[in-house]
Design a protein with these regions (language model features):
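Accessory terminal regions of nucleic-acid processing enzymes
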Residues: 20-24, 147, 183-222
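Hydrophobic/aromatic-lined pockets within catalytic cores
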Residues: 30-31, 118, 138-142, 201, ...
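Non-catalytic, well-ordered alpha-helical scaffold segments
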Residues: 48-52, 131, 210
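Mg2+/Mn2+-dependent nuclease catalytic core
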Residues: 84-191
Length: 222
């Protein structure tokens, strides 16, 4: 296929898009073929509650290891990067929304709230997402939010643990929380995106993934 096309990436689509099935990801980005599945609304509710509670509070509420700063969790505008280039000088752009950031005295930390099991494995799952947010905000399109310098990144995980009380109408749910720091590495991210662009610019689509439900469904109906 022609290599002059400029692909736009969403930071959240790497882990559950490209990593899940390269065939389906290729069809989505190259041919516009997308199977849309509803996102459980309960996670959006949790996300909203978390952002509302932590907005304007101290970073120390997330982790004592973080430098003192104010949490900003009410920025709801889309973010857009300038035109970026991979290791083969192929252009691409990025766009998406952040959960929040911490405003320190001389720097910023990007944070993302996750309602998920608490495990260090989540660092690897969400590394490209957080690294992408940082790159977008340090190299924004004109008019998009610019934060500089962004020295730290991380995910703040919420894992429901138990119900302490109930009266028939409501209940108190406790959640364990954990901050996981993610290393900022722009070169590693560009290398990763270069690999994605190699797949998307190939004349041949990736093979179907035997562990992908959509690929297996396609086999049965074609």
């Amino acid at each position: 296929m022609a290599t002059d096309r400029i692909f736009n990436f969403s930071p959240s689509e790497f882990a559950f898009g490209f990593e899940s099935c390269q065939k389906c990801y290729y069809d989505k980005k190259v041919h516009g073929i997308v199977l849309r599945t509803p996102f459980p609304s309960i996670f959006s509710k949790f996300d909203s509650l978390q952002k509302n509670y932590y907005h304007t509070k101290s970073s120390k509420l997330i982790s004592q290891d973080l430098e003192e700063g104010e949490i900003v969790a009410n920025y709801n505008k889309m973010l857009y990067s300038e035109v970026l280039y991979d290791n083969k000088k192929r252009p691409f752009t990025m766009s998406g929304k952040i959960d929040g950031y911490i405003k320190h005295k001389d720097s910023f930390t990007v944070i993302d709230f996750k309602t998920t099991s608490i495990s260090e494995k989540k660092i690897y799952t969400y590394t490209t997402q957080l690294q992408s947010y940082a790159l977008m905000m340090q190299k924004p399109r004109k008019g998009s939010l610019k934060l500089e310098p962004i020295n730290r990144l991380g995910i703040f995980c919420f894992d429901p643990s138990n119900i302490s009380a109930t009266n028939g109408k409501d209940c108190s749910i406790y959640m364990n929380t954990k901050w996981f720091e993610i290393k900022r590495d722009d070169q590693s991210l560009i290398k990763y995106i270069s690999g994605i662009l190699e797949v998307l610019n190939s004349e041949e689509a990736p093979k179907e993934n035997p562990s992908c439900g959509i690929c297996n469904f396609r086999k049965k109906i074609i």
